[in-house]
């Protein structure tokens, strides 16, 4: 992750260079000293410097992601994270990760076309690890499908879903040869439930609720909860739907889920005995 923080990387290189220079000066001034233990100590010290800088970069990245996924500050997150799209990242997984997180922030703001454009422009280059390549494409298509679903673009969502299920089948076939404890699970439940709701007006609330409960990120909890609320309303369960929508508005009033929830609340017919708004 240090490649995402050029200043931190530059600082690490400077520290390493200074450290090695000091070791060189010490050996030059103490020619009688045995160089082997000095170099061993230097290697340990150098490793500590490098590891500490990598850990710092990792923590900085985690804090940035927390702003988006748990603090729900999409605008602040993008202000600091979006410029990383311009970094010359050689590691394909890191480059994709940056795009996935950025696209999630775009979606949180309702900027689905920009999210789709960002993800569609990324080509997974073949590597020696075919499974990793499929995993990368699976992540991209899953997000693209979700964007299309939130735009209510059924043809695109169905096309992405078909590709997603095909990728899932290939990945599961690869996992079949591995010990059971080492097998990965590839979930398409959220995409399937959302598409089912758009196509048929029905979705399994129980499945969606389990996805909310198993998710640790507040942003995703809220986004899934919006779908649950829509299902409740379609089932004429106004009480639960209204309750959930009010919670979403309270938690994320400035984000896309909160704004949609507010619109749905405003569009509800007045209850018996109440004056229309």
Placement of each model-derived feature along the sequence:
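N-terminal alpha-helical membrane-insertion module
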Residues: 1-78, 84-86
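Helix-turn-helix repeat elements of alpha-solenoid scaffolds
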Residues: 34-40, 66-82, 107-122, 154-167, ...
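N-terminal topogenic membrane-targeting module
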Residues: 50-128
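"A position-specific structural signal for the A-helix of alpha-solenoid helical repeats
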Residues: 63, 94-104, 136-146, 184-195, ...
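Flexible helix-coil transition and linker loops at the boundaries of alpha-helical arrays
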Residues: 85-92, 124-134, 168-182, 212-216
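Structural signature of alpha-solenoid helical repeat junctions
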Residues: 94, 132-139, 156, 177-187, ...
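A membrane-cytosol interface segment of integral membrane proteins
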Residues: 118-127, 133-158
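Long, non-transmembrane cytosolic or organellar matrix-exposed soluble domains/tails
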Residues: 199-277
